[in-house]
């Protein structure tokens, strides 16, 4: 485990204790406090923690530190708490998403609602994971001049993510295939709202507020790169689900059988002949590996892989141009954005 990740994980137990103390202060019985603690520990720290860690990394960069190790203990704890607030937001979304999708496993363990005795209580547990964000922000940031900015940022990004989720759920229900509902424009809206805001913009905006870079022009400079970057990231994900090697991506792609409104199917629909369209209409979104292969054959006929590689190079080039024109006069740093782009450009997993 990387040192950065280990140091970040060390902060979490103290936050769980603070949340326990809040419940105890309300006179909550111990069994309920233990339930909440179990939910926090089961659902929050298990992932890659990329979003949370990038708050810390971005803050260090904006403040001019050579590495995270140069932060004082107090400074580190503060930005790590903001990072953990994103991880709590992610946990809240995932617990709810897994119920909506009737998923079985998440991060190599049973989904929370599938754990013995949890079931539908997971709905309330999801709400309580979201509530934890605001408990922690109040305790640690209430006296900061940017406190209201943090609250608005979390509220706005949460609602934007839910809007993306709504459009996704009504566009591509697993049990009712209707490809006429799909389009590249709709796909773009879904991925920007469902993924880009909370996975890319949120971490950088939080680090900016903590570092005192709060001019709306700088927040706009960040979002103007990070939102299209987040869209590019999700398009990569869609592409890899279909064309990535299972040994690279660590899973077998299921988007075709799951009727996902993915970039791949939308590009195919845009370019398909009448015959190819009929094949996709009859075979996409069916739990049948032969039908999946028929879709894949159409994707190959349409040279989706070539279209993707052209898209990737054009997008990366556009983003690099935007980054080159960043105005750093108020303390924002283009390097933050370069690091994000370099992490995902040409990724295989």
UniProtKB/Swiss-Prot annotation:
Cofactor: how and how many bound: Binds 2 Mg(2+) ions per subunit.
Pathway: Isoprenoid biosynthesis; farnesyl diphosphate biosynthesis; farnesyl diphosphate from geranyl diphosphate and isopentenyl diphosphate: step 1/1; Isoprenoid biosynthesis; geranyl diphosphate biosynthesis; geranyl diphosphate from dimethylallyl diphosphate and isopentenyl diphosphate: step 1/1
A cellular-component GO term for this protein: cytoplasm
Enzyme class: transferase
Gene Ontology biological-process annotations: farnesyl diphosphate biosynthetic process; geranyl diphosphate biosynthetic process
Essential cofactor(s): Mg(2+)
Gene Ontology molecular function: any one: dimethylallyltranstransferase activity
The keyword Iron is assigned to this record: no
Chief site of localization: cytoplasm
UniProt keyword Lipid biosynthesis, yes or no: yes
Catalyses which reaction(s): isopentenyl diphosphate + dimethylallyl diphosphate = (2E)-geranyl diphosphate + diphosphate; isopentenyl diphosphate + (2E)-geranyl diphosphate = (2E,6E)-farnesyl diphosphate + diphosphate
E.C. numbers: 2.5.1.10, 2.5.1.1
Residues that bind isopentenyl diphosphate: 48, 51, 90, 107
Compartments (UniProt record): Cytoplasm
InterPro entries: FPS1-like (IPR039702), Isoprenoid_synthase_dom_sf (IPR008949), Polyprenyl_synt (IPR000092), Polyprenyl_synt_CS (IPR033749)
Function text: Catalyzes the sequential condensation of isopentenyl pyrophosphate with the allylic pyrophosphates, dimethylallyl pyrophosphate, and then with the resultant geranylpyrophosphate to the ultimate product farnesyl pyrophosphate.
Name of the protein described by the UniProt record: Farnesyl pyrophosphate synthase
Native organism: Kluyveromyces lactis (strain ATCC 8585 / CBS 2359 / DSM 70799 / NBRC 1267 / NRRL Y-1140 / WM37)
Name of encoding gene: FPS1
